[in-house]
Amino acid sequence: MEKIKLIECPRDAMQGWKTFIPTEIKIEYINKLLEVGFDTIDFGSFVSPKAIPQLADTKEVLNGLNLAHTNSKLLAIVANVRGAEEAVQYNEISYLGFPFSISETFQRLNTNSSIEDSLKTIDAIQHLCVRHNKQLVTYMSMGFGNPYGDAYNSDIAIHWVEKLSQLGNTIFSMSDTVGVSNPDTITYIFSNLVKAFPSLEFGAHFHSTQETAMEKITAAYDNK
């Protein structure tokens, strides 16, 4: 029987808000999401508060979540080994997510490191996850293109999945960071990824509009 996992991502929705969302409101909202039945909730981030002030209260939010009566798992984003070392100490967290950008420019803007350095970081985080019984989810940022003029085509995205899988990564979320994907590029990437790497798990993380959301979801679903 085929299984599709739904991952809800309040962390991504919240992190760009300029006005700080009170911790108790975050807790209340995420607790409601935990009642829905999502496979996983991407709820917070173990990164520097200077980088993402909105998520500086991730530990407080975690302490306020009601996990006793839910099957939903928790995912937290990390951007370096220090953050991963902190996140793996929490038994409540099942997944660590790392944003790996296919765009060199965005990788430096987002994590203050090059793609080459990020490969070393991912390798270290993967070893941490194995030791602490966590799973690493690699968010393939700018997975469908970028606005910086950095080289991109679908085969470049597939190349980086292959490279990262050699480090032991098994879960990849192909992320349309700036909303440039379309059904054709989605179909090409997922049909080729699933064929080339049948043992890996692939997810689709789209930024879209109401008008184009369903056609993107359908393209990914039809090529699962």
Regions found by a protein language model. Name each.
Residues 23-24, 28-32, 36-69, 78-86, ...:
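Glycine-rich, positively charged N-terminal anion/phosphate-binding segment
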Residues 177-223:
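Catalytic alpha/beta core domains of metabolic enzymes, predominantly
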Residues 103-170, 175-177:
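Conserved anion-binding
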Residues 37, 89-96, 166-170, 192-201, ...:
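Glycine-enriched alpha-helix->loop->beta-strand junction motifs that scaffold or abut catalytic
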Residues 1-18, 98-110, 131-148, 193, ...:
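N-terminal small/glycine-rich loop or linker at the start of catalytic domains
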Residues 4-12, 39-43, 72-78, 94-98, ...:
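Hydrophobic faces of well-ordered beta-strands that scaffold small-molecule active sites
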Residues 39-64, 98-113, 142-148, 173-184:
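Glycine-rich, proline-tolerant flexible connector loops at the mouths of alpha/beta enzymes
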Residues 51-76, 116-138, 186-204:
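Alpha-helix-loop-beta-strand connector modules within alpha/beta enzyme cores
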